[in-house]
A protein has these predicted regions:
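PRPP-associated nucleotide enzymes
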Residues: 1-172
Length: 172
């Protein structure tokens, strides 16, 4: 569906866009990059290496899938950030936005902690699956409403290690 070279090219483009934003808008202030675990770790690690600006790394865990292929609709925080974000610029880095529920939840949760700004980046965006209105500031690819794996995305813990993104068919 999306091969390794396309992913690398797009992640580098996003890194350049975020670098330009940081240099223009943030001046000498760091950007805290919050990786949403587990699925975003590959995208996150490649993205932060493509950014030539002052960034800080942190991690947050959130789940709305469990072992299913469709969101349960209930978002749970499974791991919190380790540093205060009050008065800071924050970017949530997510693997995929489908229903929008997770990003909406995280955005509201982090905004309540009084950062200067909360932004978001997502590798994949499924506009046809949206249940709440949410659009990331930076999007890698828009895709159809299919279940996908690879490049950090999994099915019941499997396939995260694929270097590409593949559509899963005939799940039973």
């Amino acid at each position: 569906m999306i091969d390794e070279k396309k992913i690398a090219r797009r992640v580098n483009e996003l890194g350049k866009e975020i670098t330009q934003f940081c240099n223009k808008e943030l001046k000498n202030e760091p950007l805290i990059m919050a990786c949403v675990l587990k699925g975003s770790f590959m995208f996150y690690s490649d993205l932060i290496r493509a950014i030539d600006a002052d960034i800080r790394t942190d991690f947050i865990g959130c789940s709305s899938y469990g072992d299913a292929t469709k969101s349960t609709g209930e978002v749970k925080l499974t791991l919190d950030l380790t540093h205060s974000i009050e008065g800071k610029h924050v970017m949530i880095v997510e693997d995929i936005i489908d229903t929008g529920l997770t990003m909406n939840y995280l955005s509201k949760t982090l905004t309540a902690r009084n950062p200067k700004r909360v932004m978001s980046a997502a590798l994949l965006f499924k506009p046809d699956a949206m249940k709440v209105k949410f659009k990331a500031d930076y999007i890698g690819f828009e895709i159809a409403n299919d279940f996908v794996v690879g490049y950090g995305l999994d099915y019941q813990g499997y396939y995260r290690n694929l270097p590409h993104i593949a559509r899963v068919e005939n799940l039973q």
